[in-house]
Curated annotation (Swiss-Prot):
This is Bifunctional protein FolD. Homodimer. It comes from the Bacteria. One of its GO terms (molecular function) is methylenetetrahydrofolate dehydrogenase (NADP+) activity. Keywords: Amino-acid biosynthesis, Histidine biosynthesis, Hydrolase, Methionine biosynthesis, Multifunctional enzyme, NADP, One-carbon metabolism, Oxidoreductase, Purine biosynthesis. It comes from Sodalis glossinidius (strain morsitans). Its EC number is 1.5.1.5, 3.5.4.9. HAMAP family: THF_DHG_CYH (MF_01576). The gene is folD.
Amino acid sequence: MVAKIIDGRAVAQQVRSEVAARIQARLKAGKRAPGLAVVLVGGDPASQIYVASKRKACEDVGFISLSYDLPNTVTEAALLALIDQLNADHRVNGILVQLPLPAGIDNISVLERIAPDKDVDGFHPYNVGRLCQRAPLLRPCTPRGIVTLLERYHIDTFGLNAVVVGASNIVGRPMSLELLLAGCTVTVTHRFTRDLRRHIENADLLVVAVGKASFIPGEWIKPGAVVMDVGINRLESGKVVGDVDYASAAERAAYITPVPGGVGPMTVATLIQNTLQACEDYHDTTMPEA
């Protein structure tokens, strides 16, 4: 068996094109384009790359992009004050604070300060709670992006045994909730899981997000499984690989996401979707006209 490649770049471009078309329709109707405020604290190179891609994506679809680059010496109080300002700004429909934050700033306090209806990353406890209650509003970007890939490839998830490897707040935990909504029987594995191989060998749908290059060998993959690889790992050679050994896994899986070009592009595309959703569902009545 040779797996069918799930092309995240192509689907992400479809999503962006759909959003761009809706923005043009808004502008023709006399409405203002959505606004996304992106806050970057410090000069972490990886964060700078991620933020640049998000800002460019905003501009490409016609959003108003507001940038706030703060030094790593900024105090938590000053960062919270900026978030309060953005919460009250009617031009801003979404607020994104790039993680990780420098030492001395509490991630939880910062994420909780963002108004839930502007939390386009989907990390606020209110939005995670809504997902848990089977009534999602703004959903975490990477898990929602994975669900979009499954939907666009017409992969029927009802009744599947799904295994999530990794239990982070950003991917693993919300991914498990998304898969429950999608009708799967879900197992979440983590660093204390015993006999990881046994769990993976039983997975009809496997989502891996641990940040370890080629951590899952292909021989563990159940024949005919769907493999969603969230990992992005750069080797000393400069090559970027996922958390799953791609070549060997592709010989057993029915569908697989490549790295790069699989899940990654969907994270940014979903951020764009969430920002438009926040604008249309929560802020249209308070936004000034164009």
